Structures are given as C-alpha cells and as structure tokens.
Amino acid sequence: MEYKYLGNFSWLLDNKLAGCDLPGRYNHIDDDLDYLHSRGVRALVSLTEQKLSSPKLKKFSYLHMPIVDMTAPGEQQIDSFVRFVDRMWAEKKPSVVHCHAGIGRTGTMLACYLVSKGNEPPKALELLKQKRGYGLFTPEQYEAVELYFWRKKAASSRRK
C-alpha cells in the first residue's frame, strides 16, 4: 500500500520545530515515524494520553507529556516542553509535537514556544495560523498562552 501522509505535519520554525497529528492515526505508526525521520525530525513530544508504542521510536528523543484532549497544558508542562525543545535544538535535533488532531494541544504548546522566544500572544497566534493554518480550539488553551506570557514577563521583571 502506498504511503499517504502524516496529517497536519508542518514546520512552525523551519527545520527546528513542527507540529502534526497522532502518528499512526491514518497510517501504520512505523510508516509515520519513518516519514518524520525522513523530514529531519529527531525529537518527538507526545501530548496524547497514551504513550506511543513502536520500536522505531528508538530513532527519536521522546518525551511523553499526557494532556487531556480539549484542555490546556499546565505551567510545568509548558516549561518542560520549552526546555526539551531548546535542549534538542542545542543537540541539532529538530522536534515535532503532536496530539490527536495536531491542532489544539499541539497549537497551544507551539504558541507557548513562540512566546518563550519573545513573541506576545497575539503575534504568536498569528504566526501559528500563518505557518500551520490553525489557531487554538478552546478558551482554556488561549488562556494558557496568555498566562504563560504574563508569568514569563513577571519572572523577567523580578530579574531586573
């Protein structure tokens, strides 16, 4: 059978950070992991409630961070995600983050990553929509991006 594609795969930051839907959702998980690897991805962040299971995961640095569908990540999860992506990039390992559809939870984490690099929430969400064609699903997810921004801003003020 011919490989179709991995749904919603796109780079937010070229060859550094991407988002996609659940590997194995439409194809065999191994085919999707091979596809990601062929696109240069070397680190995988899974936001689904269940861990991925495949021997091909050994090709990737893997972080499982379960978040209930249609909800937002907590502060510690966002901080862990940002640190993981930064660490992977320092090791020259482009990362992909996924949830089930690759939109809500994935978009929230991607927007928070943009905020961590100095973007205000409206700009982060605009960039997310430009690059990926999607925004966020729930008010709770938008609020998580806003709260992350204000928490970062408060922490920055305390250091001055």
List each model region and its residues.
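Cys-dependent protein tyrosine phosphatase-like superfamily
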Residues: M1-V96, L110-K160
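Conserved G/P- and acidic residue-centered "switch" motifs that form tight phosphate/ATP-binding loops
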Residues: G102
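Ser/Thr-glycine-rich phosphate-binding loops at phosphate-binding pockets of nucleotides
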Residues: T106
